[in-house]
Amino acid sequence: MKTTLYFIYLLFLVLLFGCNDTKIKREIQQLQSKAISFPYNMNFTIHGRDTLISEYVENGLKLVIYTDSVECSSCVISKMYLWNSIIENTELYKDKLKFYYILSPQRQHIEKVRSALNVIDFEYPVIIDTLGKFAKLNPHLPENKALHTFLLDENNNVILVGNPLRNKKIEEMFYQIVEEKLGKPE
């Protein structure tokens, strides 16, 4: 009897994790099914102040770090400094690799987000998507926030999904893909 219960429990765990794996694969395939679109009039912010950057959406590789309205934007902002090492490691690629930090906070949190961005020591532009345009243009974005960081090729097709800060393998793949696409840094 104990053996049968143990076997059923083990089978349940295998099915549970197997289904989760299948769901993640399906979400990644969905994300890769269409190119990512960017709104034409994105508001960039540096240190909480609006900045006009007209040439930002252009050819080249793009790493998108997207935070939707469900996530805690202030929590994400407080950890943005962690990206500094990856930015520094890729600075030699100059304009061939861009980083897109897209925050889509709830309306009632917009001022709090701007204040938090003003305080942090983060020199890179951040997009505050107050109207949720990014998500509307990309209905194929998965709900799973672990899949909200992705690398795009020059045509905005997703070529890597995952956060290089949270997964060493993703980090290695990120640098490998960047080097394959852009060559060795100058």
Question: Each predicted region: which residue ranges?
Answer:
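Sec-dependent signal peptide recognition
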Residues: 2-10
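C-terminal motif of bacterial Sec signal peptides marking the signal peptidase cleavage site
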Residues: 15-18
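N-terminal "domain-start" segment that seeds a small globular fold
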Residues: 20-57, 77-79
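Short active-site neighborhood of thiol/selenol oxidoreductases, capturing the structured segment around
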Residues: 53-77, 83
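Short acidic, S/G/P-rich loop/turn micro-motifs used as interaction or catalytic elements
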Residues: 69-74, 106-109, 165-166
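Structural microenvironment flanking redox-active thiols in thiol-disulfide oxidoreductases
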Residues: 76-119, 133-136
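Short, internal strand/loop/helix patches
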Residues: 114-146
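Thiol-/selenol-based redox modules, centered on thioredoxin-like
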Residues: 145-146, 151-186
